[in-house]
């Protein structure tokens, strides 16, 4: 199973707006799997957690933050329970929320939430097979990924992955 979490359409001029935007993004990733709520492979606790993720847009602000922090990890647990396979997580444009937050002045509020959301899913998670993260900004030492192990960073000018993504000199 594969989860795509795209931050491409993130927007938010305030921390409160950013929470609403993250809720829409998480919901967009989870709704494709909504049919799994009735799957007998899910236990009651996973089902209830998954329902919170599916209803994240309508939750009170403080509850939304908690669900956002754990939502990706919950979705991975659900997929692992149903499909009995580790999950591939694709995170597209991870840096868009951080760039918005820095520009609008709420970076220090958003950073810990985004770090918990992504690190919780991508570090020490038995449900993860592989994670691929894309973004325009170079990953700095103090980023949402500082806690991750076995992390590689590649730019478009790197040639080591060129054949795998169709960017060889011949092409």
What are these regions (language model features)?
Residues 1-171:
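Phosphate-binding site recognition
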């Amino acid at each position: 199973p594969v989860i795509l979490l795209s931050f491409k359409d993130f927007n938010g001029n305030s921390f409160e707006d950013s929470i609403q935007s993250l809720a829409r993004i998480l919901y967009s990733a989870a709704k494709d799997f909504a049919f799994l709520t009735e799957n007998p492979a899910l236990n009651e606790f996973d089902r209830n957690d998954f329902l919170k993720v599916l209803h994240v847009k309508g939750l009170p602000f403080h509850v939304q933050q908690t669900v956002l922090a754990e939502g990706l990890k919950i979705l991975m647990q659900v997929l692992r329970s149903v499909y009995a396979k580790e999950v591939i997580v694709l995170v597209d444009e991870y840096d868009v929320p951080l760039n918005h937050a820095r520009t609008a002045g709420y970076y220090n509020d958003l950073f810990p939430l985004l770090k918990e959301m992504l690190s919780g899913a991508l570090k020490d998670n038995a449900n993860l097979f592989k994670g691929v993260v894309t973004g325009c900004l170079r990953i700095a030492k103090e980023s949402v990924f500082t806690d991750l192990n076995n992390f590689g960073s590649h730019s478009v000018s790197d040639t080591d992955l060129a054949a795998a993504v169709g960017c060889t000199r011949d092409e």
